[in-house]
């Protein structure tokens, strides 16, 4: 499951994000995006046709997962427990992305680990390609293989 920020960094040519996306594609790893990620990416008001095409090209290497009732209810559960158990306000888009990752048993690739780290106790696996860039390859593959 790829978070919005990784795609934004990929489009900007940021090395760690570009590397992570290339690794996912080259190693034929199943890639998922939530429809909320698609909405966030296309909601920038000044996107050119070329930028829209690049976004679509990145999204086309994976599968877009719709927000259905299961995802919505899991997201609601995550938001409630985030507030109740951790006194954290989990934004709805983040809750949807996390819920989708959990329901798919997928690793969430994000730079915003801080927003999600409390959900590790509830089974969410996170990978930040910006951490320890020098040994990314080994850590990335082992993290994905654990699931």
Task: Please place each PLM-identified region on the residue numbering.
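Acidic catalytic patch
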Residues: 63-84
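Alpha-helix capping/helix-boundary segments
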Residues: 6-7, 37, 71, 96-97, ...
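Short, well-structured N-terminal submotif of metal-dependent ribonuclease cores
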Residues: 1-33, 43-56, 135, 143-147
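Short active-site oxyanion
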Residues: 27-31, 61-63, 102-107
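Acidic, PIN/NYN-like endoribonuclease modules and their adjacent C-terminal/linker elements
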Residues: 98, 102-147
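Donor nucleotide-sugar recognition loop
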Residues: 86-93
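Generic structural signal for small/hydrophobic residues in well-ordered secondary structure
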Residues: 3-4, 41, 75, 101, ...
């Amino acid at each position: 499951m790829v978070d919005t920020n990784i795609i934004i960094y990929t489009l900007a040519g940021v090395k760690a994000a570009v590397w992570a996306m290339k690794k996912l594609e080259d190693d034929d790893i199943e890639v998922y995006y939530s429809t909320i990620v698609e909405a966030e990416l296309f909601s920038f008001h000044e996107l050119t046709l070329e930028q829209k095409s690049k976004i679509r090209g990145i999204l086309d290497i994976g599968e877009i997962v719709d927000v259905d009732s299961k995802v919505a209810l899991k997201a609601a559960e995550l938001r409630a427990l985030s507030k109740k158990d951790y006194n954290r306000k989990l934004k709805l888009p983040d809750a949807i992305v996390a819920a989708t990752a959990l329901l798919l048993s997928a690793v969430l690739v994000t730079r915003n680990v801080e927003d999600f780290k409390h959900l590790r106790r509830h089974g969410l696996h996170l990978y930040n390609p910006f951490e320890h860039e020098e040994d990314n390859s080994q850590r990335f593959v082992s993290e994905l293989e654990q699931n």
